Amino acid sequence: MAAKSKNIQVVGRHIVNGVRSRAVAYGLFTSRNDHTSAYDKNVEEELQPSQVPDEMIKPDSDKYWSPHPQTGVFGPSSSSTNAKDEFRGGQEDSVMEEKAWFRPTSLEDLDKTHHS
């Protein structure tokens, strides 16, 4: 009889422990969903898209930006190019025309021979 009641107690403990572990697991699962972080996006702080009124946009603007012929830098295009810029551009040497010297990397790994 004592063995039978002992078995009932063991089975009862397993059932109670299973219910407790499910409750704890459920509690952990719900707390993960409620987690907030300082890095979360705040919807109210987002910038809302705005439209530019048509009066502000000029359809036939005479000031377009284009690349400079020598430098390639974009800026407001001008109908007359500066003569000084053209003269100076012709005088300067191109970077492509400069000589470059390269040291072979294979020399760094060689052992120096000592002549005696």
From Swiss-Prot:
Residues 37-116 are annotated as: Disordered. InterPro entries: At5g17165-like. Residues 55-65, 83-101 have a biased composition (Basic and acidic residues). Pfam families: LEA_3b. PANTHER family: OS04G0598000 PROTEIN (PTHR35122:SF2), OSJNBA0093F12.14 PROTEIN (PTHR35122). Belongs to the LEA type 3 family. This is Late embryogenesis abundant protein At5g17165. The lineage of its organism: Eukaryota, Viridiplantae, Streptophyta, Embryophyta, Tracheophyta.
